[in-house]
Amino acid sequence: MISTRVMDIKLREAAEGLGEDSTGKKKSKFKTFKKFFGKKKRKESPSSTGSSTWKQSQTRNEVIAIESGPVGYDSEDELEESRGTLGSRALSHDSIFIPESGQDATRPVRVFSQENVCDRIKALQLKIQCNVKMGPPPPPGGLPAKRGEDAGMSSEDDGLPRSPPEMSLLHDVGPGTTIKVSVVSPDHVSDSTVSARISDNSLAPVADFSYPAESSSCLDNSAAKHKLQVKPRNQRSSKMRRLSSRAQSESLSDLTCTPEEEENEEKPLLEVSPEERPSSGQQDVAPDRGPEPGPPAPLPPPGGARARRARLQHSSALTASVEEGGVPGEDPSSRPATPELAEPESAPTLRVEPPSPPEGPPNPGPDGGKQDGEAPPAGPCAPATDKAEEVVCAPEDVASPFPTAIPEGDTTPPETDPAATSEAPSARDGPERSVPKEAEPTPPVLPDEEKGPPGPAPEPEREAETEPERGAGTEPERIGTEPSTAPAPSPPAPKSCLKHRPAAASEGPAASPPLAAAESPPVEPGPGSLDAEAAAPERPKAERAEAPPAGAERAAPERKAERGGAELRGAKKFSVSSCRARPRPGVSRPLERASGRLPLARSGPVWRSEAALDDLQGLPEPQHAKPGPRKLAERGPQDSGDRAASPAGPRKSPQEAAAAPGTREPCPAAQEPAPSEDRNPFPVKLRSTSLSLKYRDGASQEVKGVKRYSAEVRLERSLTVLPKEEKCPLGTAPALRGTRAPSDQGKGKARPPEPLSSKPPLPRKPLLQSFTLPHQPAPPDAGPGEREPRKEPRTAEKRPLRRGAEKSLPPAATGPGADGQPAPPWITVTRQKRRGTLDQPPNQEDKPGARTLKSEPGKQAKVPERGQEPVKQADFVRSKSFLITPVKPAVDRKQGAKLNFKEGLQRGISLSHQNLAQSAVMMEKELHQLKRASYASTDQPSWMELARKKSQAWSDMPQIIK
């Protein structure tokens, strides 16, 4: 506006200096306008006043055009040289876009005007009449008014097809021009210029205000183009690409987000929009995850950013309104009524969270505990939000431990908002949960997230309610542990909470994909899981940069189920906003999401396992050794139990009880892996995601087309499939879901995306189970006695495996579980490669059951030993395990069809026992033997063996490089 006003002043000065000198300059500079200038001189002699007045009106219009966008003046001198120059150039630009037919039509009118102009009075009268006509009815009178103006104006306007700009400008300037003419008619150019200045002063702002709407025609040349050229347009393009699939879900979610809520929170949206814009800027820098087109990178620069901001603002407004209306009040009716909306909104809230913190503090009231727990890791983010949250948390966090964490949490308002969002979803899940939240101010915080995943289904919500009640005891313990740990390592304590939440979130996503079939249920679990995941990124600040992508990836599949692109954006913005220092992780997330959001969850396990292998050995041990041993050990069992129960809850309430204890054991290891996986998943994620996303998407489709077990065999091609199937024959199919979440937790929350991706499609579930089979049996061990025989041996295995997972989670977490395959990443990659070729192997899978047993003991032995081995050895074992893993897939494939599910379970149990006893001895011998047997006896062609070796080498390469 200021620049446009300055231009207006300059134009006015030019209008004042509209002398013959300016016309002479025009002649020298613009030969094309010489004729028009000559006509101008002639017209000026008969009616200099009229021409000047019309020129001024043109200048006004031109000024408006200039304001709308750069008209292309080479210098201010040209502007000052003459309004004619300005008009000519502005019209010249318009002429480029506007046919000259209008000019021709106006010329005859101009001729009449010239004749009439012979008398200045007549000319002015005609002009005034035209202006009056144009002013009141600008659209209809615009053309005639333009003609009248052209008649009044010098031939410059005649030459240029200025009618279109005048149309819109006249609409804006119509009354002003009339005033100008009235003032100018008696006076000369100086008076007209003065009047023009006055009218410009009044009109320039008017034109500016009207420009957004009216400038569309005029601004198409300049301002509109610039706007389109700005980042938003690129963001829109990339976003359109990413959101092509999201658009529908987002539009639905945005539609679900009532405009009323958006209106109610327009102010918060305004607040959010600035922060979202920075976050979107970061995202834009990321080019949306570049891939996604960047976490935010994929987000189209301007258009996409604007659309995204608008969507995010809508979603954030909805989330803010939902949280404000729902969380503080915890209106179960509103949230349950709009669980999908509320949770998609909650996801957006995560996005908006930096701006939404003002909203969040009222919302977090019940969420304060969670937010405080989550916030400490994100400490640097938002002290302001945490202040409000502290106020809110004080009542909510009856348990003071989180208040202690609150100071740290003060730095992490974004994450606090995520917590609020997650709690809002949980509150949305039902007032019952919110009641446990309040009753157990801090303990329910984790349960809330846990509840959030189970909450997707109303029944799971009830189960989750029971879970919070169950976990109430454990969570109070958590609280006790957290408070004690929170004062000194309060960020680690929230980290552990975040870890647990990511586990719950991953489980929630895992549950949400299956629930995705149920449509609304996945939406609800998604937000909780998203929040948990969002909290997960917060766990360690160091991890944040890496963790947010993992959380975002986890959230991406869930959000796909919920909102699709909208929630993904929320995750992006949440990651960016929660950790504005995490623009990179946010970027990587969108990249992964862009590649394939659900596939990201699918591939997420792969790259997470790889990242877990790398990070767990390197980072997770020290970091988790601090918060992990204390809080993971304390909270790990409890939180994992609650989480396992909550993910299982949506699927199977009995298994919630079973999974809760089982998961508790694996939870510490799982918790440690999760951050590491979140940390390094980006490069690995991107690599594995492109392949694994396609591969897993195809696998899920195949599973849909093919029987679940056959698809599982193909997907896993390892005994893990058999254990999965074994669990299913035991009649624990729902338990499998529940145990999967626990096993995923025990395995390492590095795989939470896997549960998410694996749960929606049946085959994916087997994959998760197969990878986590040793841990999964253990959750059953702690839980119901259905699988006690399996559970007992596998529990023993799980514990050493968990230890190994803590030290070298890649083998344990990546391993099918009992097999302890450390190479799920390469296995997934090789599976992707093999799937095309190994769709044949299902026959081979039937062949060597004994080999599978051998490979399982050997690999299981590997896992315990790895747990014992130092991190370096774990890394070395990784390469070996990756080399060995092909054996299991081949053997498992062969066995998959032959072995019955029960037989497979029995073998798995026996193998687990054998593995425990033989792990040390079998390690290297069986590794080599299994390698040989798997390559030689898999009945696979040599090219398959080579492919395996190559895939293993490639999978090992990133680790070695790292």
From Swiss-Prot:
One Pfam family here: DUF4592
UniProt feature, compositional bias: Polar residues: 46-61, 245-256
Biased composition (Low complexity): 407-425, 503-521
Domain of life according to the entry: Eukaryota
Residues covered by region (Disordered): 38-102, 131-174, 212-871
Disulphide-bridged cysteine pairs: none
Ranges of Basic and acidic residues composition bias in the record: 266-278, 429-440, 459-480, 536-546, 555-570, 631-642, 709-728, 784-806, 844-869
Positions where Phosphoserine occurs in the chain: S92, S490
Composition bias, Pro residues: 292-303, 354-365, 753-764
Keyword match Phosphoprotein: yes
Compositionally biased spans, kind Basic residues: 224-244
Protein keywords: Phosphoprotein
Protein known as: CRACD-like protein
Species of origin: Homo sapiens (Human)
Organism taxonomic ancestry: Eukaryota, Metazoa, Chordata, Craniata, Vertebrata
